[in-house]
Amino acid sequence: MPTVNQLIRKPRQPKPVRNKVPALKGCPQRRGVCTRVYTTTPKKPNSALRKVAKVRLTTGIEAVCYIPGEGHNLQEHSVVLIRGGRVKDLPGVRYHILRGVLDTQGVKDRKQRRSLYGAKRPK
């Protein structure tokens, strides 16, 4: 605990604000090209094969992005749009791929929360 004199000499420094999505460079979304599409396993209490893609963005940065929803059509050289938003049980995955935009198809037969998965309204 500093003394009053020490605080007068050198005041407290505010904590620097850390950017949670540096690859987006302040933009809401960014376009990129898939360089690798693969599956990975989550952290300890959970168990699954999560679908992720390594994406080279227009900013030149490579980011690991999660592919939400059941089934996808992504492969190498697919052009995708990414947004911020981490996946809690996948370390290093800080971005989501937007479904139903550019080369990514929407989730088939999706009835609820369709806008998040790029699914059209069922007839």
From Swiss-Prot:
**Could you provide one GO biological process annotation from this protein's UniProt record?**
translation
> What domain of life is recorded for the organism?
Bacteria
Q: What GO terms are given for molecular function?
A: rRNA binding; structural constituent of ribosome; tRNA binding
InterPro entries xrefs: NA-bd_OB-fold, Ribosomal_uS12, Ribosomal_uS12_bac
Please tell me whether the keyword Repeat is annotated for this protein. no
* GO CC annotation: small ribosomal subunit
In terms of CDD domains, this protein maps to: Ribosomal_S12
Q: Which PROSITE patterns match?
A: RIBOSOMAL_S12
Per the record, the similarity remark reads: Belongs to the universal ribosomal protein uS12 family.
State the oligomer form and interacting partners. Part of the 30S ribosomal subunit. Contacts proteins S8 and S17. May interact with IF1 in the 30S initiation complex.
NCBIfam families (alphabetical): rpsL_bact (TIGR00981)
Which PANTHER family does this one have? 30S RIBOSOMAL PROTEIN S12 FAMILY MEMBER
What protein name is recorded for this chain? Small ribosomal subunit protein uS12
